[in-house]
Amino acid sequence: MNTLSQAIKAYNSNDYELALKLFEKSAETYGRKIVEFQIIKCKEKLSTNSYVSEDKKNSVCDSSLDIATQLLLSNVKKLTLSESEKNSLKNKWKSITGKKSENAEIRKVELVPKDFPKDLVLAPLPDHVNDFTWYKNRKKSLGIKPVNKNIGLSIIIPTFNRSRILDITLACLVNQKTNYPFEVVVADDGSKENLLTIVQKYEQKLDIKYVRQKDYGYQLCAVRNLGLRTAKYDFVSILDCDMAPQQLWVHSYLTELLEDNDIVLIGPRKYVDTHNITAEQFLNDPYLIESLPETATNNNPSITSKGNISLDWRLEHFKKTDNLRLCDSPFRYFSCGNVAFSKEWLNKVGWFDEEFNHWGGEDVEFGYRLFAKGCFFRVIDGGMAYHQEPPGKENETDREAGKSITLKIVKEKVPYIYRKLLPIEDSHIHRIPLVSIYIPAYNCANYIQRCVDSALNQTVVDLEVCICNDGSTDNTLEVINKLYGNNPRVRIMSKPNGGIASASNAAVSFAKGYYIGQLDSDDYLEPDAVELCLKEFLKDKTLACVYTTNRNVNPDGSLIANGYNWPEFSREKLTTAMIAHHFRMFTIRAWHLTDGFNEKIENAVDYDMFLKLSEVGKFKHLNKICYNRVLHGDNTSIKNLDTQKKNHFVVVNQSLNRQRVSNYNYDEFDNLDESRKYIFNKTADYQEEIDILKDIKIVQRKDAKVAISIFYPNRLDGLVKKLNNIIEYNKNVLIIVLHIDKNHLTSDIKKEILEFHNKNQINILLNNDVSYYTNNRLIKTKAHLSNMNKLRQLNLNLEYIIFDNHDSLFIKNDSYNHIKKYDIGMNFSSLTNDWINKINAHSPFKNLIKKYFNDNDLKTINMKGASQGMFIKYTLAHDIATIMKEVITLCQSTDSVPEYNTEDIWFQFALLILEKKTGHVFNKTSTLTYMPWERKLQWTNEQIESAKRGENIPVNKFIINSITL
């Protein structure tokens, strides 16, 4: 291994003294500029005195080690034990870890507190751990935008010989269609062939560099790192020399990366044979690479075949997981022959691990570090590249043999997914543990041994303990070093005092595990605490946090009382009270998706942290008493109650603000310091957000006599496009009433609506009177009735109201001349058996039908039809609404909830009642909406254009459904 590789290995192992010496030595060989950044980082680490040199742990004394550590070292011959000694230790360990956590008392509770506002909607959670769509929307909501200084793509092409194939790949890069700048860095791993000649051939066609290292054998990671250090742009791509990119490859990668620089992009691949084609042919025909037939390969040990061609083995998984969005371990599909990402991630996770000096595994290990630090992975079709198969269909790398070597390294360094829970007899100390228990320690010399020992004496042994001494003024650090300084499962750091939040951030950052457990320095765990939580994580990879409950004990361990236990988790309850008590474990990935512990507050630090975690992933609560909370009078949780209370309400409101909940404040109910009674108060600007046109006078237009009522079910995407579509085809519209979820009413959308109003002089009324927590079978009907009530308050001179759909599209001009021929446009059809069964199960409505029609046979009554595109004379609409309100009141009085879509039947029912009461049969026709049998499919642009021309659309139809606007 060369000096630079040794330096990187030492740095990644936290041996910064050795790393600094080796980087200084590397500077003599490679030049100061190449390693200057690493030298600075080493000096920063050393100056903080926040680590313990690995040299101090070389000498292992078995007498000072916990039992599990002795057994683990013995399993791999690093500690010599006789068989009797080993059996004795096993029996002691089983005795120590044999105690099981007690069940906590469970009581029935409301999952959502009764006083939690119905219209307070918390931000959505991701569908899975790699939900890049959720993350992108979250950053947009928080106003987080990427800051790029040097936009462009640096393409790193590692190569060893294979000049002919490299020639073709460079030719395909010449053919790129993009306005973005890019450079090519050919990184040579000591080739015997003269690659410089190939590179010089393209100096006039590409911005190209050539860097080379001596042939030390298979050093793919080292040569990748060499190329990456040479890169000048903010974004980098790694492209194997045999991967020929399609023409929009650069453009596709950069377009996505500029939108989100916290994502790794992965390109799929196809296998082609180019050995009878020259680079000049590709230069002369940019489409040639994409036109080649797919072929078979013997290169990849994991290849999938279909007939006579080989397929990218990842394609099926890409399809199943929505391009990895729903994948629990996307780094396993991070094949570095064709990827792109922001260069700043190298500063966050480090470089490729140069210990991998055989084929395979290095990309998985690097990808895992990206994943653990909070990076997202996404496959894009625009990243397609064509794998050029060498003559004979095999290359010079012995891949199968290499994989057998590197897989062992992967299992040592990638605990998540690649690690199983094993009995202690079959376990050893891994270089990267599965679990880290972190302990912030300050002046706790009297308690720290019991605390640390409880973490080491867990039934799960794939575990480390990370202790951060936060500038203790007693002998805490001395005790820790004496007891655990030589323990390979304990890592110790020390820093100047900064408070519990600072120590927690330092300790979690110091931890190596994927699953992180929190333990206060004066408390201690039950032996199965980690195992109970870990099993939940392993069952459900979408969990961000698992927590148990605790008991309060005296310093001597005697019971005071069991701790407070809320038996079931809900985000709404956590928003009102800290229910996520010790013992708590979370994933390091989830933690990195937050900004960590808040070092600006002294109390409510944990509450703030777990509110943040609850915003990025699911929680699971276990009703087990796994944690012993020692009360000795100096606990931070029972001191400074006034500050605690203040910060309690501060952190909840900060959580609501992060989730863009702007209509409520979480306020204290009384002035008692020990009280956490609360009240949700509506914010002062709440009505201003909704009634954005309150200061704008209604614009009266002589020929405008139509109102349109629309219900938006959730997001307001495409709202302004919808408004423009309405007025383009309907010149007689006076006002549009939108029932919306105000949580999606952003300042940008409000601005667009105001601009629309000012430009077109069309009145817009926003309404949100109906709670979006209402049963979804009734909500749309209530929303339209509420819209009509808002209109009535304005006393407008209207002739008709149209009930439009948020995702429909007008396609023909002048619906007004059509609808004014009729009183009402509704669809009337017979009820299916499914509808009849649901109505019969809804006794209030069934009784009304019997009352007015004296007929139990619902098949004889035609009153079913989609409400989209329905229109009614304005005066009749209010009569119909009055009847419908009576139906709703009756349902509410009996607390009976319908199981059918009321908007598709209650309008028709009310009209039939009105005709029966008045004895007048109104002039009726069908709705304005055309909904073909394939209505659940989205309309294509071609279908829309065809519909605008009136092709295949009935002459009396003016709206089509459903459109993505």
Swiss-Prot record:
Q: Which GO terms describe its molecular function?
A: glucuronosyl-N-acetylgalactosaminyl-proteoglycan 4-beta-N-acetylgalactosaminyltransferase activity; metal ion binding; N-acetylgalactosaminyl-proteoglycan 3-beta-glucuronosyltransferase activity
Task: Keywords in alphabetical order, please.
Answer: Cell membrane, Glycosyltransferase, Manganese, Membrane, Metal-binding, Multifunctional enzyme, Repeat, Transferase
Record localization: Cell membrane
Per the UniProt entry, the Enzyme Commission number(s) are: 2.4.1.175, 2.4.1.226
Q: Where does UDP-alpha-D-glucuronate bind?
A: Y442, D470, Q518, L519, D520, S521, H582, A604, V605
Query: At which positions is UDP-N-acetyl-alpha-D-galactosamine bound?
Result: P158, R162, D189, Y218, R224, D240, C241, E362, D363
Q: What is its main location?
A: membrane
Which InterPro entries has this protein been placed in? Answer: Galactosyl_T_C, Glyco_trans_2-like, Glycosyltransf_2, Nucleotide-diphossugar_trans
From the UniProt annotation, give the residues forming the signal peptide.
Answer: none
Q: What does this protein do?
A: Glycosyltransferase that catalyzes elongation of chondroitin, a polysaccharide composed of a repeating disaccharide of N-acetylgalactosamine (GalNAc) and glucuronic acid (GlcUA) units, by alternatively transferring the GlcUA and GalNAc moiety from UDP-GlcUA and UDP-GalNAc to the non-reducing ends of the chondroitin chain. Each chondroitin unit has the composition beta-(1->4)-GlcUA-beta-(1->3)-GalNAc.
Q: What is this protein called?
A: Chondroitin synthase
- Whose protein is this, by species? Pasteurella multocida (strain Pm70)
